[in-house]
Amino acid sequence: MEVRVEIGGIRLDKALADLTDLSRSVANEQIKNGQVLVNGQPKKAKYSVQVGDVLTYQIPEVEEIDYVAEDIPLEIVFQDEDVAVINKPQGMVVHPSAGHTSGTLVNALLYHVKDLSGINGVLRPGIVHRIDKDTSGLLMIAKNDDAHTKLAAELKDKKSLRKYWAIVHGNLPNDRGVIEAPIGRSEKDRKKQAVTAKGKEAVTRFQVLERFGDYTLVELTLETGRTHQIRVHMAYIGHPVAGDEAYGPRKTLKGHGQFLHARTLGFTHPRTGEVVEFTAEAPAIFQEALEKLRKAEYIV
C-alpha cells in the first residue's frame, strides 16, 4: 500500500503510524525489515519525511479468529424479530479479537439470540455500536440487515438517545454544560484517544446529579460516538472518570475499571417506527460506591 506525506519534518516511523492503521511498533518492525520504502528507497526509522514523499508499506496479515456460541449469562432487556437490547456487564469485550477469542458479547449473542445481522462481518454479527470492555450498560443489537442499516443510520444522524452515568473526580464548577472538542488517536500513545485538532467532531453534554466533595455523579449524553469519548472528554476538562486506568489518576475509587454505565438507550424501532426507550440501573459495584460516597466512606 502507498500513502503520500502531507506534513513534513517528522520521523518516518511516526509518520507511517499517523498516516495508516499501523501501530508505532509495527511500523518500526516493517522499517527495520526493509518493508517500508520512501520514494522507492528503504530508509531508517529516524529519517525525516518531506511533504510529497510516497511511503510504501505492507498490510499485516489478518489473524483468523474462530468464534463459537457460548452459554454465557446475558441480560436481554428487550427482544423481538428485529432488535435486541442487551445490558452488557462490566468486564465483557463486545466482539472477538486476537486477544479475546471467547467470553465476548458476540459469543453470548450467538448462543442466546442466534439470528443476527451480517453487515459488520462474521466477527461482529448484530453489533451496531460498542461500549468499552470495562463500561457496563445498554447496547442495541440488530437481528437482520434491514434493522442494522436503519439503526446505524439513526446513530450517524445523531437521532439515537444515549445517556450514561459516571462517577468523576472533583467538583464540577457548573451543574450542566457541553463539551465540544474533536477526538482522534493520541500521538503520544497509539492505544489511546485524545482531544486533537486533527480529530473528528465530538460533543458530550453533562448534567450534575450529586456532589460528594472529591467526586461527582454526572449524567452524560452523547451527541457523537467517538472511541472513548466520555472518558477522553471528562479527562480533558479535568474531571476524569473514577477508576479509569487509561485516562485518570492512580489514586481513585476501587472497582473493576471505570465507573461508567450506559444507563439509557432510545431509538426509533426499524420496523414499527415507534420511538422506544430503555433504562438499566448501574451495577452493584457502582451503587455500592455511591452509597459509600454519600456516607463519606471514601474508598481510595
Q: What are these regions, as identified by a protein language model?
A:
Residues 1-300:
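RNA pseudouridine synthases
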